[in-house]
């Protein structure tokens, strides 16, 4: 019963009827879906049943019944008939037509000429000249299913061509050079055991970062130079994905393309080959000339914040020094990892609580981390809005109690190590705490928790905050942490501070695999000539005065000062001593007259800085790729017991693994070869199931990606 006196009956074939007080009022059979929909419409329109009850009985959403009623009111019963999908006429690519196309292509005709001579489109020509397989058999294949319901291709009836070469795109290159093509569309090269095709595993996670969408929003689709559209074979999509895939196979620099097979990378892009190094650099220079790299970074950050709100309540801020080995007059910075001051540029990086990259910019010369925190506050506030109260975590380089007070007033919490640590806490003040981190590990801390007041402005003011001290029982060392967070569990705060190593791991991994220190461009820009720098003449004069003072002190220690002041002292010795004292006075006076700082133009008139516009674009692409890899590593964890230690190494192996590519209807099947060990193969197979659930479309097409591993 679906209402008072109203009954719904339908058999397994789909035929049914609706009875009103025992009378069969509406009926339909399984071959007439229009009559079935009409019955649903009329039983609601006559008021004998509620729309919700009818929807439940017919097994559809209530909105669907409402839509049927609207369609019936507008177009009558004809509007209720289902629209027939699929081909409207027989395919033009008969076996005879395919043979004719291949004959003309073999004779040297271009794709456009073959299309004109045979009366089909250029797309049909490309399909026809692909690897020869009987069309009827290919269309007759039926997909099997995975355990979760996703489709996975069966063993092909006709084997794919091993190491198949992509279709040559010479006609499109000629069209691009003639100004007739905005961007070459991707054409998938089907085949088996294609090298590096495992890199396509990154696409679902890369789509979540919004990289391609952000690049299109900032720079526009296709190719633009000075705001004007230009023709191109390699569009923005191809350029960005080229950098992504080269990073995944451990060649993050542009010159690394010379060490990769251009055809293998071209297959990943849906093209016949990847751009050459010269072309890639030239096109990246065009993008850099737009001076919109910071906009790209902010667009990616907005997507990251929206997609992962659980990761953006805590931010880690740190600087990274990139050593410079060129011949330009670049300023020096201290490179901590080699304990040496040398020409270098300093970047400020912001990561989320899991260590994934969020923002990066070039630091001002000589700027401290405390100074960079002021820029960080503005950028994060722009991302999170005025009501959020995030936590900024940094090391002792950002120490400034005055700045801490300003940050708190601006709606931020701070978390840092205490500089100039005070007296140690007594052993009785420490309490044992346990904390379960995001990886499920139990952390044990001995912590002392109390409120302190930190002086600043020459002890005229005090900054009140919370101090959490960790005791290492083995060594007796105490680590003092300052924060304005009021979490009831001090172990949570301590763990957040100690998790700052994630930033160091980020730097280390990016240096090793993503070209963090890559120069990317040789262009330089003039340094600020009015910027005040240390005066080397002042330093030299002070050193001379110190040398004179040391000489006098050495003589006094050798002979005794009294020996120079005795009445019977050697006259020549006394005169020498007096002369040395006079020389010391002269040198001190000279040092005082020399200014401590002078404009940069006085000291180093040729000083320059590295132009980082192109590098910032490359960094944005690399950072998004790293974040996508991090997402895959997290998805891999339930499927691989050693994921905590080996997830990224397993992913790098998978990225370089050969795979089959096959188009089946509207799906693109990616079947990876087995990996180096059965457990690693099973782990990647589990990852494939996770990725299939995302329903990701290959960029630039309407093909749904379906991943699997052979033999699983």
What kind of feature is each model-predicted range?
Residues 40, 101, 205, 242-243, ...:
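Short, conserved catalytic/metal-binding motifs centered on acidic residues
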Residues 15, 174-181, 405, 409-503, ...:
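An anionic, glycine-rich sequence signature occurring as long contiguous blocks
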Residues 33-49, 94-108, 240-248:
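Short, amphipathic alpha-helical "recognition" segments used to contact nucleic acids or chromatin
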Residues 52-58, 113-115:
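Short alpha-helical "recognition helix" segments of helix-turn-helix
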Residues 61-64, 121, 276-280:
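Short coil turns linking two alpha-helices in DNA-binding domains
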Residues 11-19, 24-32, 37, 147-340, ...:
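Dynamic "connector" segments at or just before major functional cores
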Residues 77-90, 133-160, 292-299:
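Short Lys/Arg-enriched helix C-cap and helix-to-coil transition segments
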């Amino acid at each position: 019963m679906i209402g008072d006196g109203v009954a719904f009956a339908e058999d397994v074939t789909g035929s049914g009827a609706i009875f009103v007080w025992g009378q069969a009022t509406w009926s339909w059979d399984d071959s007439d879906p229009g009559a079935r929909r009409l019955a649903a419409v009329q039983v609601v329109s006559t008021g004998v049943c509620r729309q919700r009850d009818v929807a439940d009985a017919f097994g559809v959403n209530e909105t669907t019944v409402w839509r049927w009623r609207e369609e019936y009111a507008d177009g009558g019963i004809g509007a209720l008939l289902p629209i027939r999908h699929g081909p409207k006429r027989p395919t033009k690519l008969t076996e005879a037509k395919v043979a004719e196309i291949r004959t003309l292509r073999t004779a040297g005709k271009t794709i456009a000429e073959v299309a004109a001579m045979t009366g089909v489109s250029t797309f049909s020509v490309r399909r026809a000249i692909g690897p020869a397989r009987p069309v009827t058999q290919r269309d007759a294949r039926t997909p099997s299913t995975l355990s979760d319901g996703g489709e996975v291709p069966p063993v092909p009836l006709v084997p794919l061509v091993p190491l198949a070469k992509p279709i040559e795109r010479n006609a499109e290159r000629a069209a691009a050079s003639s100004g007739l093509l905005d961007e070459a569309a991707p054409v998938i090269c089907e085949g088996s055991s294609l090298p590096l095709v495992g890199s396509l595993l990154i696409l679902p996670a890369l789509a979540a970062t919004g990289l391609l969408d952000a690049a299109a929003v900032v720079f526009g689709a296709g190719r633009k130079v000075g705001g004007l559209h230009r023709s191109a074979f390699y569009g923005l999509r191809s350029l960005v994905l080229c950098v992504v895939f080269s990073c995944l196979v451990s060649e993050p620099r542009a010159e690394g393309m010379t060490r990769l097979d251009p055809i293998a990378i071209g297959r990943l892009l849906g093209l016949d080959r990847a751009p050459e190094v010269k072309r890639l650099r030239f096109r990246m220079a065009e993008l850099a000339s737009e001076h919109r790299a910071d906009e790209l970074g902010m667009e990616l950050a907005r997507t990251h914040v929206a997609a992962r709100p659980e990761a953006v309540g805590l931010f880690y801020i740190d600087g990274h020094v990139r050593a410079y080995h060129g011949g330009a007059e670049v300023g020096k910075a201290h490179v901590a990892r080699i304990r040496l001051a040398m020409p270098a540029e300093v970047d400020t990086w912001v990561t989320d609580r899991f260590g994934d990259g969020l923002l990066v910019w070039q630091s001002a010369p000589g700027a401290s981390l405390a100074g960079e925190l002021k820029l960080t506050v503005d950028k994060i506030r722009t991302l999170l809005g005025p009501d959020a109260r995030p936590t900024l975590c940094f090391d002792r380089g950002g120490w400034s109690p005055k700045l801490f007070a300003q940050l708190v007033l601006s709606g931020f919490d701070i978390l840092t190590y205490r500089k100039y640590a005070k007296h140690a806490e007594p052993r009785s003040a420490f309490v044992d705490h346990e904390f379960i981190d995001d990886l499920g590990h139990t952390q044990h801390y001995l912590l002392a928790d109390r409120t302190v007041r930190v002086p600043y402005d020459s002890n005229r003011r005090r900054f009140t905050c919370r101090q959490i001290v960790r005791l290492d029982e083995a060594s007796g060392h105490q680590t003092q942490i300052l924060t304005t967070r009021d979490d009831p569990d001090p172990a949570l705060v301590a763990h957040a501070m100690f998790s700052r190593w994630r930033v160091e791991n980020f730097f280390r991994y990016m240096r090793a695999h993503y070209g963090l220190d890559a120069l990317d461009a040789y262009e330089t820009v003039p340094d600020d000539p009015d910027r005040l720098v240390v005066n080397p003449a002042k330093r030299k004069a002070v050193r001379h005065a110190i040398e004179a003072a040391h000489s006098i002190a050495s003589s006094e220690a050798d002979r005794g000062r009294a020996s120079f002041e005795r009445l019977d002292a050697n006259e020549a010795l006394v005169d020498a001593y007096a002369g040395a004292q006079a020389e010391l006075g002269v040198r001190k006076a000279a040092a005082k007259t020399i200014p401590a700082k002078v404009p940069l133009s006085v000291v180093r008139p040729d000083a320059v800085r590295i132009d980082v516009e192109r590098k910032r674009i490359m960094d944005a692409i690399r950072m998004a790729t790293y974040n996508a890899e991090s997402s895959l590593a997290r998805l891999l964890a339930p499927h691989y017991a050693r994921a905590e230690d080996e997830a990224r190494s397993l992913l790098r192996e998978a990225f370089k693994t050969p795979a089959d590519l096959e188009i089946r209807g509207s799906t693109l099947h990616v079947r990876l070869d087995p990996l180096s060990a059965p457990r690693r193969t099973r782990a990647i197979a589990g990852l494939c199931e996770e990725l299939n659930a995302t329903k990701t479309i290959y960029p630039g097409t309407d093909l749904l990606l379906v991943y699997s591993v052979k033999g699983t």
